């Protein structure tokens, strides 16, 4: 039996693609139902995080689909109504500093890719250092976008601290949009959720 919720397989996403009206949503509903039905009584029940881009799964008219997935409307997360009840940042409590260093590079690249603006190597490196410093301040607990921007600003030359650059612009957008909670309030591994987009 394949443990899709374990950490042995690092990338267990499923992609369903097709043209408009080809039945992608229905196929996805059938697949999720089959996967959940076959695994729910096993030692490795398959849970999911579904990003509902078209609003079909979160539409009250399609509540029957929720029953197929063995969830109810409380599993629908709407970031427009309230922040997603989890943090996008890892908890590195008790972990090696090098893990944070590697993560900071990955996270800096991810943040930089949000906006198409030109970002210099210096800005990217400064962001990575800011993430490391934010983790030091939080004692390796999950950081926040506010904490990262404060550390980023502190690393800027004095003359540039009051100015926005591409990195600060992206971070300010993330802060203003308030998409995520500052701590995990749900378990994304043990439960299934639909994120209304």
Each predicted region: which residue ranges?
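P-loop NTPase motor domains
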Residues: 30-197
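Basic- and hydrophobic-enriched, low-structure N-terminal and domain-boundary segments
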Residues: 1-22, 26-27, 31-42
């Amino acid at each position: 039996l394949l443990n899709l919720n374990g950490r042995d397989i690092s990338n267990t996403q499923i992609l369903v693609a097709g043209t408009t009206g080809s039945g992608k949503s229905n196929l996805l509903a059938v697949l999720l139902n089959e996967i959940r039905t076959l695994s729910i009584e096993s030692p490795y029940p398959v849970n999911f995080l579904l990003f509902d881009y078209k609003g079909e799964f979160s539409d009250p008219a399609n509540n029957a689909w929720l029953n197929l997935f063995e969830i109810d409307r409380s599993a629908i997360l709407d970031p427009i109504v309230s922040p997603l009840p989890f943090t996008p940042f890892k908890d590195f409590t008790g972990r090696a500093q090098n893990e944070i260093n590697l993560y900071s590079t990955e996270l800096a690249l991810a943040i930089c890719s949000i906006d198409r603006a030109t970002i210099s190597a210096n800005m990217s490196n400064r962001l990575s250092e800011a993430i490391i410093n934010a983790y030091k301040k939080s004692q390796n607990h999950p950081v926040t976008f506010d904490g990262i921007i404060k550390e980023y600003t502190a690393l800027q030359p004095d003359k540039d601290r009051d100015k926005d650059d591409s990195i600060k612009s992206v971070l300010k957008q993330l802060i203003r949009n308030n998409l995520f909670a500052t701590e995990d309030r749900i378990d994304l591994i043990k439960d299934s959720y639909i994120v209304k987009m």
